[in-house]
């Protein structure tokens, strides 16, 4: 999608930046947002993988949340901004729009990327980092899965980003406001890191990753019952899969 995105008032920007959407406790660490990955697959089965980019982003957020050198924007907040800006159905977001989106999210850096599937379980993932302030693109990466293992591929990508992405710290906040932000982030981070530890010990095939991505879509669309059914289907295959377990609990509490 190459359409223009209108930016709201400064009040909207300020509200977005102030929202408690960060998942790492260090208040002076730079804020990073992971956007949904583009489906760059081709062939007659291309459309079958359209939802996978959301699942890849969600799992990458979970994995990167354990890095104390950055604060990562929650996927729920990203989805909310995409809905506000009428970008939910966009197949891809151009760099200029991505920068504007980053400002609304209060992020200093964006991780964007795409994936290609060969239809047999092997994925090729590319990613890059965009500076919201300058629009500069850095840290281009290209990785291929070792067999039908989406989590292994995301783990590789997360490790490379965490290792190679050298982000300067922001001025440290002081006073009660900083303490309140830090406390809220610590509590959210604990849950995310628990999920990240679980994902590293398992393999997740493309078919199940697509199922998980569809569950996220149903959850975002306000269909908790359908989302719960899909999360249960994922957990039937992978009982210890933390992200699915956490999201199932969330949709159950909202009306399953």
How should these model regions be labeled?
Residues 8-20:
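Bacterial N-terminal signal peptides
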Residues 24-71, 78, 83, 181-256:
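A structural "domain/chain start" motif
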Residues 22-24, 100-101:
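Short, flexible, glycine/charge-rich loop motifs used to bind or transfer phosphoryl groups or to couple energy/partner
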Residues 73, 110, 170, 243-244:
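Secondary-structure boundary/capping residues
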Residues 1-5:
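N-terminal secretory signal peptides that target proteins for export/translocation
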